[in-house]
Design a protein with these regions (language model features):
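Alpha/beta-hydrolase fold nucleophile elbow
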Residues: 226-238
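Glycine-rich nucleophile elbow surrounding the catalytic serine of serine-hydrolase chemistry
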Residues: 236-246
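Alpha/beta-hydrolase-fold serine-hydrolase catalytic core, especially in secreted/extracellular enzymes
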Residues: 1-125, 280, 300, 306-375
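Glycine-rich active-site/cofactor-binding loop and its immediate structural neighborhood
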Residues: 102-161
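Conserved hydrolase catalytic core segment
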Residues: 249-255
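Cap/lid segment of the alpha/beta-hydrolase catalytic domain
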Residues: 136-223, 269-272
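Mobile cap/lid helix-loop segments that gate and shape the active-site cleft of serine hydrolases
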Residues: 209, 256-301, 307, 320-330, ...
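Alpha/beta-hydrolase-fold catalytic nucleophile elbow
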Residues: 183, 235, 260-261, 313, ...
Length: 375
């Protein structure tokens, strides 16, 4: 029967029809991307606090700041929706921590231990704890959780030879901060993507595992006598920067967050067919999340971090995005903080480098909001 299905239309080219159909679908998707900023505003910010909606034309030098109480109360609804609808959750209860550790490195300034914690049956969290030496008895220090990027390991944040990380976890420990470098699952192409795809079938993602690991890590850190449990900050590069907007948005226990080498106009990063650094042109097929483009981009995730301090580190030569996209998305973050009179609690640093920890404005941001460790 298939042999009878011959094309007998004179001059008809099915390739032309295929191209029209494809370009029509692409045009529809790009029209949704173009309208996604407005869709996200209507979904979250303007719904949680209607006064944030732009008013009439103004020539006033200054506008009245808003009370954040209504926005903070209402935004808990979106925090829950973000975790349940975008990140995903598991029904299983977290296991007792059952911490195990071994000392693996020591310098004149600090000692480092590998630490392993139970999360779920068959699933463990692990990372590198770096304790400054000579912490006085009874002294409680702030912690900076230093998150590696894709295909990285915790030691990458310590070794000076890693140009992207520049030993930032060790450098912060030398300043007197306790640092902890967790291992995240995005290592071993493409095995972690298979895990993400399997989790999709039950409403989860790779970050369902990562968020659970961080909950266990925070619970354990707070048990340490040297740790100030109210001052645990997050600082991540690349996929660790992606973690820096997702995990603290869900877990309020992180007192501030720094996103390095990742802050983006995420919706365009995922769906733009022309941007050379976009996910349409990479092997990272786990990056699309269901309906995320009309719900949460980086500004909205930062809105879930608000009113905690939030900082962005952006290299001019970092190909994960463009300066223009980053500035566009960050402008929404600063406007949100400024609307509530808290613009001093957010910042961005552009530096003349690449996909790297710069450690200048970001370190000063940590000192400002955590205090100088040991003082």
């Amino acid at each position: 029967p298939l042999a009878l299905m011959r094309e007998e239309r004179f001059g008809f080219n099915p390739d032309d029809r295929h191209r029209r159909l494809f370009l029509g679908m692409e045009k529809q998707v790009q029209s949704l991307v173009d309208r996604s900023d407005q869709a996200r505003d209507e979904f979250f910010f303007f719904e949680a606090e209607p006064v944030l909606r732009p008013g009439s034309w103004s020539t006033e030098k200054s506008h009245e700041r808003l009370s954040p109480l209504n926005f903070l109360t209402r935004s808990e609804e979106w925090r829950t929706r973000f975790e349940e609808e975008i990140i995903g959750t598991f029904d299983e209860e977290l296991l007792p921590l059952n911490p195990r550790s071994r000392k693996i490195r020591e310098t004149d300034a600090w000692t480092a231990w590998d630490v392993v914690l139970d999360v779920y049956p068959g699933f463990e969290a692990w990372g590198l704890l770096i304790l400054p030496k000579n912490i006085p008895a009874g002294d409680k220090r702030p912690v900076v959780v230093c998150q590696h990027g894709r295909n990285g390991v915790p030691l990458d944040t310590v070794d000076e030879g890693k140009s992207a990380y520049n030993g930032f976890a060790a450098r912060l420990a030398e300043e007197g901060f306790i640092t902890f470098a967790p291992h995240n699952l995005y290592r071993g192409e493409d095995r972690y993507r298979w895990l993400d795809r399997k989790a999709n079938l039950i409403g989860g993602t790779l970050f369902t595992f990562i968020t659970a690991s961080h909950r266990q890590t925070l619970s354990w850190l707070k048990t340490l006598p040297e740790v100030d449990g109210k001052h645990i900050a997050f600082y991540g590069l690349s996929y660790g920067g992606e973690t820096a907007v997702r995990v603290p948005a869900v877990i309020p226990d992180y007192c501030l967050s720094i996103c390095s080498g990742d802050f983006n106009h995420w919706t365009r990063k995922v769906a733009d067919p022309d941007f050379p650094g976009g996910f349409m042109k990479s092997i990272e097929w786990e990056m699309p999340y269901w309906n995320m483009g009309s719900r949460f981009d980086y500004a909205e995730m930062a809105g879930l971090i608000f009113p905690r301090p939030f900082f962005v580190e952006r290299g001019h030569h970092d190909r994960v995005s463009t300066d223009e996209w980053v500035a566009h998305e960050y402008a929404k973050v600063r406007r949100l903080y400024a609307s509530f009179g808290m613009e001093e609690k957010t910042g961005i640093e552009f530096f003349h480098g690449g996909h790297s920890i710069n450690g200048q404005g970001s370190f000063e941001f940590l000192r400002r909001f955590l205090g100088r460790a040991g003082e």
